[in-house]
């Protein structure tokens, strides 16, 4: 978005299909992005065609669409931007001030062990018990913070704040020293906030597509990777098994 704004400084942007917008809470407070119902208020409008079932990192093959995600290997994720409200920033600052008062001399790791309950996402699952093991083995050295919502599983030995929406989770992440989790929305947020991160990719999608070079991306390269299968996949499970608790711990320690 930043590069588009620099190229078209007098334009407003709508994320959508040319007819209707697909609004996301992540666009809130971004003055460059408008909703389609505001289209008559501006002269220069540019549509950004990035919405459900029309993602730039995917190739939509009708023959295989129901079976797997086909990745666009020419795509490379670029860091986005998040524009917080003063209330969101104050919320995050207050939470972290309290944590640092009680535990003043430890780095804080924002951890996200949960994943969406959607088709294909089980192939991104590293395993909740392994996340718990990472926390248990490093809790004396670092503070682990987990924001959660709804039916999310909550780790033990973490500081948890429950029923926190995505934007507030991102605001909280902005004050952390490191993000640790799977490939997904929060790792993109970490990049937008210039936060170091340990991101587990497994063998489902390649970090050259949706990863960031300044993150530590844990990916298993083999002849079937990145497979993109939507149903439960033995290959993806094997790749996740090859990424050990030790690998994640080592990456965290190196980045902190």
Predicted features, each with a name:
Residues 1-256:
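Catalytic machinery of carbohydrate-active enzymes
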